[in-house]
């Protein structure tokens, strides 16, 4: 029978975004550790607050399982003679503290040997737990690690106390100069009297009694209960991002929801400014009325009880008023001038130290946009809209509002463009080029915004690729993963017929690096893009489909997307298995570096190879142009594939491909190679499961 185990790591306040990754790591490590140590357990629970990381293991076994091991001893003919164990065998068992009854003889590849079957008793869990605690804390990786004082230990934030209990027994361990005990600490809003934890079983209740809700799910539900109660009692509608709830949950240990308000005059500001100020700057929950209009009310989550709540509300209202007053000033100052005026400031804003200013970037993007427009054959009106949009799309970076609220770039550009009287759809293009900002964000509704977004991201990535600023491990300070993710979604879902590699090469030319940076950096960049693309596609398609399609190239995302959609549907058809099997047979026989020649009909002697050649010509004439155009779905209704698959099988069953006659052999290999190349236009069939 096991006991419950408790480990509480008390720290200084941990940034909210550090906590979820730590929870996952602690859970995985704990399961793996005790599995490897062969100690049974019922469940592992990881709880967290801003100041505590907690492992709670239910019914952790009191000792390791006994392990049976076999030790090979001397050869049987030495240790066992005339039905008796020899002195050699006796010395062998004495060496391991065993008896002759534990010996047996087994046949091995090297002959018969004596083996000792020994049961190794498991260690007590109490002896193992100090190592578990130390190993666990050393294993956790945070987005940023820190060292404090003169201790040689790295963690997300300084460790201040450790509680470690197995049942009611203290586990003695010292980490980063902190010795474990059974005493936790109260929240900061209470007198700092240590909290005694008598045993692991009583932990949650003792913490609740001291105004600490350790379980993040319980805490989140408490927040939801309270904010919904306030909203319902006042006939308001809650409207907030999911990330806000997650962040607030990791900012408090004992949540209390309070209703505050601000001056109605600030409702004249753009709604997005109010929401960003409340959600991002202050972590408040905005409230709407029954008609969906934003109100001048908000909910703040206090870390503590409702004692002195009026003072707390007034303090939060005062802080919000100051922020909104600043925003009002920025807005009024910004709107004194048309948006175009702020383009003058772009030459003073650095894009990247070695890649120039934002103005330099705009000029590069302008050339790239013209190139894309030419490739796509845009109309003169569409070209004019794009030209004007390029002029203005970074202008809001020169405004006061975006200087204070960088996350509003593009969004304020759209608002200011409308106020400045820019004609539709220019404000829309300016405001939407930023999307998607994350992998699950929305896409632009206007394809011209997609073009601008593609050009902007291509320019950024080309510069970073040239400078070799690739992410290392989990670190990605420039945000290459985010930028490339947005680019890939635009290319995959916009269906614009563009070649990604060619755009990178063109962008590289526009930068005019000269001999400073090699063009080969684009190859390295495409490798990085390929890995990002594969990860993105694996969320939607099976691994064999993704690898089969990517193997034939991913320069043209529109083709890749069509190939993926085609094979996903084709897999459901009866002809799929036959064609895959036939083509795989063909793939296996072709030498890797074989270069096909033109097939000579005069050398086709067998009726089976003649028929296969006719099949090849038929497919080439009837649907190959469709395949080249990316119309792969024509194959879904192409009934000839069944007959073609049968003819490949008949060819292999009746024709000697590797003929002793060299001309005949090369001719047959050339026919097979041409068939492979024809279907290679779609995917690598050998990778399909």
UniProtKB/Swiss-Prot annotation:
Subcellular location(s) per record? Cytoplasm
Could you mention a single GO BP entry for this protein? arginyl-tRNA aminoacylation
EC number(s) given by UniProt: 6.1.1.14
Q: Could you confirm whether the keyword Membrane appears in this record?
A: no
Tell me, what's a Pfam family for it?
tRNA_synt_2f
Write the signal peptide boundaries: none
UniProt entry keywords in alphabetical sequence: Aminoacyl-tRNA synthetase, ATP-binding, Cytoplasm, Ligase, Nucleotide-binding, Protein biosynthesis
One cellular component term (GO) for this entry is: cytosol
According to its UniProt record, where is this protein mainly located?
A: cytoplasm
Family matches, as PROSITE patterns: AA_TRNA_LIGASE_II_GLYAB (PS50861)
Protein's UniProt keywords contain Hydrolase:
no
Q: What are the recorded GO MF terms, alphabetically?
A: arginine-tRNA ligase activity; ATP binding; glycine-tRNA ligase activity
Question: Matching PANTHER family, A to Z?
Answer: GLYCINE--TRNA LIGASE, CHLOROPLASTIC_MITOCHONDRIAL 2, GLYCYL-TRNA SYNTHETASE
The entry assigns this protein to a family as follows: Belongs to the class-II aminoacyl-tRNA synthetase family.
Q: Which NCBIfam families match?
A: glyS
Q: How does it assemble?
A: Tetramer of two alpha and two beta subunits.
* Entry protein name: Glycine--tRNA ligase beta subunit
Organism of this sequence: Dictyoglomus thermophilum (strain ATCC 35947 / DSM 3960 / H-6-12)
Q: What is the lineage of its organism?
A: Bacteria, Pseudomonadati, Dictyoglomota, Dictyoglomia, Dictyoglomales
The gene name reads: glyS
């Amino acid at each position: 029978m096991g006991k419950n185990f408790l480990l509480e790591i008390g720290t200084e306040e941990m940034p909210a975004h550090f906590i979820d990754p730590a929870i996952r790591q602690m859970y995985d490590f704990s399961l793996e550790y005790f599995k490897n140590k062969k100690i049974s357990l019922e469940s592992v629970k990881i709880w967290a607050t801003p100041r505590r990381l907690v492992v709670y293991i239910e019914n952790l076994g009191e000792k390791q399982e006994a392990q049976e091991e076999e030790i090979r001893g001397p050869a049987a003919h030495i240790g066992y003679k005339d039905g008796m164990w020899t002195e050699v065998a006796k010395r062998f068992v004495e060496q391991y503290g065993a008896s002759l009854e534990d010996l047996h003889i087994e046949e091995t590849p090297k002959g018969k040997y004596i083996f000792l079957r020994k049961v190794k008793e498991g260690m007590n869990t109490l002896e193992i737990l100090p190592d578990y605690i130390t190993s666990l804390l050393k294993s956790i990786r945070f987005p940023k690690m820190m060292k404090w004082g003169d201790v040689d230990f790295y963690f997300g934030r300084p460790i201040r106390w450790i509680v470690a209990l197995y049942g009611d027994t203290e586990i003695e361990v010292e980490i980063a100069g902190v010795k474990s005990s059974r005493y936790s600490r109260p929240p900061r809003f209470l007198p700092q009297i240590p909290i005694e934890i008598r045993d692991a079983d009583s932990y949650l209740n003792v913490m609740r009694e001291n105004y600490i809700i350790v379980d993040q799910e319980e805490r989140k539900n408490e927040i939801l209960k309270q904010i919904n109660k306030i909203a319902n009692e006042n006939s308001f509608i809650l409207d907030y991002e999911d990330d806000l709830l997650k962040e607030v949950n990791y900012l408090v240990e004992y949540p209390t929801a309070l209703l505050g308000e601000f001056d109605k005059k600030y409702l004249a500001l753009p709604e997005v400014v109010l929401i960003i100020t409340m959600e991002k700057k202050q972590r408040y929950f905005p409230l709407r009325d029954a008609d969906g209009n934003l109100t001048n009310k908000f909910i703040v989550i206090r870390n503590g009880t409702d004692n002195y709540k009026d003072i707390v509300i007034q303090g939060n209202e005062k802080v919000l008023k100051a922020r909104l007053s600043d925003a009002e000033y920025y807005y009024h100052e910004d709107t004194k001038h048309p948006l175009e005026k702020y383009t003058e400031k772009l030459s003073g804003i650095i894009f990247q130290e070695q890649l120039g200013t934002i103005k330099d970037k705009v000029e590069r993007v302008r050339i790239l946009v013209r190139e894309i427009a030419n490739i796509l054959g845009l109309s003169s009106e569409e070209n004019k809209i794009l030209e004007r949009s390029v002029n203005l799309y970074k202008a809001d970076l020169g405004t006061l509002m975006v200087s204070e609220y960088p996350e509003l770039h593009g969004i304020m550009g759209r608002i200011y463009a409308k106020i400045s009287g820019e004609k539709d759809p220019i404000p829309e293009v300016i405001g939407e080029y930023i999307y998607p900002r994350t992998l699950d964000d929305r896409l632009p509704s206007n394809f011209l915004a997609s073009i601008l977004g593609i050009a902007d991201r291509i320019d950024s990535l080309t510069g970073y690729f040239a400078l070799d600023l690739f992410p290392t491990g989990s670190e990605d300070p420039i945000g290459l993963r985010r930028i490339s993710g947005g680019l890939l979604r635009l290319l995959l879902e916009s269906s614009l017929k563009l070649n990604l590699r060619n755009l990178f090469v063109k962008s590289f030319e526009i930068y005019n690096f000269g001999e400073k940076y090699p063009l080969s950096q684009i190859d390295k960049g495409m490798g990085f893009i390929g890995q990002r693309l594969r990860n993105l596609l694996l969320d939607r398609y099976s691994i064999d489909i993704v690898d089969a399609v990517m193997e034939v190239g991913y320069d043209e995302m529109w083709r890749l997307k069509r190939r993926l959609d085609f094979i996903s549907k084709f897999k459901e058809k009866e002809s799929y298995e036959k064609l895959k099997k036939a083509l795989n047979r063909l793939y296996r026989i072709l030498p890797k570096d074989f270069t096909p020649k033109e097939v000579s009909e005069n050398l086709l002697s067998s009726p089976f190879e003649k028929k296969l050649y006719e099949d090849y010509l038929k497919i080439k004439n009837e649907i190959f142009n469709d395949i080249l155009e990316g119309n792969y779905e024509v194959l879904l209704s192409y009934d000839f594939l069944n007959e073609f698959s049968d003819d490949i099988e008949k060819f292999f069953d009746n024709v000697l491909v590797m003929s002793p006659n060299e001309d005949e052999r090369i001719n047959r290999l050339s026919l097979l190679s041409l068939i492979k190349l024809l279907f290679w236009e779609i995917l690598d069939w050998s990778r399909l499961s």
